[in-house]
Swiss-Prot record:
HAMAP family: IPP_trans
Residues that hold ATP according to the record: G10, P11, T12, A13, T14, G15, K16, S17
GO-annotated molecular function: ATP binding; tRNA dimethylallyltransferase activity
Matches recorded under InterPro entries: Dimethylallyltransferase, IPT, P-loop_NTPase
GO biological process terms, semicolon-separated: tRNA modification
PANTHER family from the UniProt entry: TRNA DIMETHYLALLYLTRANSFERASE (PTHR11088:SF60)
Phylogenetic lineage: Bacteria, Bacillati, Bacillota, Clostridia, Thermoanaerobacterales
Record-marked site positions (Interaction with substrate tRNA): T101, R124
Gene symbol of the encoding locus: miaA
Highest taxon in the source lineage: Bacteria
Assembly and interaction partners: Monomer.
Protein name, as recorded: tRNA dimethylallyltransferase
UniProt source species: Caldanaerobacter subterraneus subsp. tengcongensis (strain DSM 15242 / JCM 11007 / NBRC 100824 / MB4)
Signal sequence, start to end: none
Annotated function: Catalyzes the transfer of a dimethylallyl group onto the adenine at position 37 in tRNAs that read codons beginning with uridine, leading to the formation of N6-(dimethylallyl)adenosine (i(6)A).
Presence of keyword Transport: no
Length: 315
């Protein structure tokens, strides 16, 4: 019989982590993160990682599992997350997958064959060296040649995603956009997914929330966090340090831009990322959307979601 899983998805800054904890408490569950940046140790502020206090004693998996200089593929995520889901289920608890990384979610709900593609660290290193020598734009032009569809969706300065798209094409012969299309993909029969999407009807409210969150990160010493990571010896060209919120602070520390400019770049980049996430999650035909601004309080939103889940879950 298929394992019932709850997935809580949506753009950044919509309150997914908080809701996941409440759902876990109400329905006897454990949380599995589906966030490609929260897997990294020591990167807490810039990734808006849930704190021990916020977890309220609920076990959280797939957080703080790799060093910032380590590579971590979707195939690796799929393998580990599926083993954890199985274990949670076998212990009689509800697996709750929460996060905004679309490919991580896809690796669970669809048959993706990610595990057939491990990629190549050598290839990624070679691409990073080319970017250091000729600039990110050189690789972006290459991507436009082999996968114009992916190039349209990826920002010209997003080195991490550019390299990933080139790598997929290099080793599978197919563009990454091929793997990102949900139409025609087969659902994974191992799972019976109940997917909840959190969003705002008023996009401006979401953008304001994002801006406030970035200001909070700066207040909570994001700059210091990046300084410490660089001191430990993590390379500014490493996968993790190319992440949104980190690469801009590195630019500031290198004297390339002011702190104000770095903050604005993070806000703009995060708003753009949220837009991409919304587009991605709208493609799921089995998602049930809940709009935060439809409710007067968080408690009202939470109770509505509890009611919906109670009608769907098989106890």
């Amino acid at each position: 019989m298929a394992i019932q899983i709850v997935l809580i998805v949506g753009p950044t800054a919509t309150g997914k982590s908080r809701l996941a904890v409440d759902v876990a408490k109400r329905f006897n569950g454990e949380v599995v993160s589906a966030d490609s940046m929260q897997i990294y140790k020591y990167m807490d502020i810039g990734t808006a990682k849930i704190t021990k206090e916020e977890m309220q004693g609920i076990p959280h998996h797939m957080i703080d599992i790799v060093e910032p200089n380590e590579e971590f593929s979707v195939a690796e995520y799929e393998k580990r997350a599926k083993a954890i889901i199985k274990d949670i289920h076998e212990r009689g608890k509800l697996p709750i997958i929460v996060g905004g990384t679309g490919l991580y979610i896809n690796s669970i709900v669809y048959i993706m064959h990610f595990s057939d593609f491990e990629g190549s660290k050598e290839f990624r290193e070679k691409m990073k060296k080319l970017a250091e020598t000729y600039g990110t734009s050189y690789l972006y032009e290459k991507l436009k040649e082999v996968d114009p569809e992916a190039a349209r969706k990826i920002h010209p300065n997003d080195l991490r995603r550019i390299i990933r798209a080139l790598e997929v094409y290099e080793f599978t012969g197919k563009p990454i956009s091929h793997y990102q299309k949900m139409s025609g993909m087969r659902k994974n029969p191992e799972y019976d997914p109940i997917m909840i999407g959190l969003n705002y009807k008023n996009r401006q409210l979401l953008y304001e929330k994002i801006n406030r969150r970035v200001d909070e990160m700066i207040k909570n010493n994001l700059v210091e966090e990046v300084v410490n990571l660089l001191k430990i010896g993590y390379n500014k060209y490493g996968t993790s340090m190319q992440a949104l919120g980190y690469k801009e602070i590195v630019e500031y520390l290198n004297g390339e831009i002011s702190l104000e400019e770095a903050v604005e770049k993070i806000k703009k980049g995060t708003r753009r990322y949220a837009k991409r996430q919304i587009t991605w999650f709208k493609a799921y035909d089995f998602i049930k959307w809940f709009f935060v601004d439809d409710y007067k309080t968080y408690e009202e939103l939470r109770e509505n979601i509890f009611e919906y889940l109670a009608g769907k879950l098989k106890f």
